[in-house]
Amino acid sequence: MSFTGTLDKCKACDKTVYVMDLLTLEGNTYHKSCFRCTHCKGTLVISNYSSMDGVLYCKPHFEQLFKESGNYSKNFQAGKTEKPNDHLTRTPSKLSSFFSGTQDKCATCKKTVYPLEKVTMEGESYHKTCFRCTHSGCPLTHSSYASLNGVLYCKVHFNQLFLEKGSYNHVHQAAANHRRSASSGGASPPSDDHKPDDTASIPEAKEDDAAPEAAGEEEPEPVVES
């Protein structure tokens, strides 16, 4: 079996990678055997890796080195002292100057976002778990999201809610109505059309009912004595 013409190079060892041994992540190519944590050399899989400036880590060591204190300069120095390696020796000054004291906040939940869990879209930062469709809650990706006034949607529901109607006015109006309903604290009072008619509760006198009374007022006929 030959793989003539392949030019893919492993990001870790810079050697040719053939299809049978290929892993592609974040636009970079790796041998499966080279896809390892820089800190502990443990083998990584797609579900348990993290990266910083192209350097690979398992999630436990990434959190230990970067996330716990929020100060990347301190964590890099601690990592280098505990277990020196080529990547940490070359890169701490660049990373620490860029990430020291990060104050990025998630546009959805307003909490701090660390690089391990950050998605950046249209100048806003999000936790990966917060980057979801507002309508259905489904996870979004760079290629599947749409937004209106900073509100996130999947493209399917964006098309369903907005594009099919050809106007956004009904969306803004629905939001305004919802806010007014919430501030009123309950249902609105009934209109005049639904108020009971006071006169309807007074029954009208019937002719049959009035007849006995009228008959009682007639003078009795005289009695004829024999």
Curated annotation (Swiss-Prot):
GO terms for cellular component: cytoplasm; cytoskeleton. Predominantly expressed in flowers, in the tapetum and in pollen grains. Detected in leaves and stems. One of its GO terms (molecular function) is actin filament binding. InterPro entries: Znf_LIM. Residues 191-209 have a biased composition (Basic and acidic residues). Residues 173-226 are annotated as: Disordered. Keywords: Actin-binding, Cytoplasm, Cytoskeleton, LIM domain, Metal-binding, Repeat, Zinc. Signal peptide: none annotated. Residues 210-226 have a biased composition (Acidic residues). It is found in: Cytoplasm, Cytoskeleton. GO terms for biological process: actin filament bundle assembly. Pfam families: LIM (PF00412). Residues 8-68, 104-164 form the LIM zinc-binding domain. Binds to actin filaments and promotes cross-linking into thick bundles. Has an actin-stabilizing activity. The actin regulatory activities are inhibited by pH > 6.8 but are [Ca(2+)] independent. Cross-links actin with a constant of dissociation of 1.3 uM. Interacts with F-actin. PANTHER family: OS06G0237300 PROTEIN. This is LIM domain-containing protein PLIM2a. The lineage of its organism: Eukaryota, Viridiplantae, Streptophyta, Embryophyta, Tracheophyta.
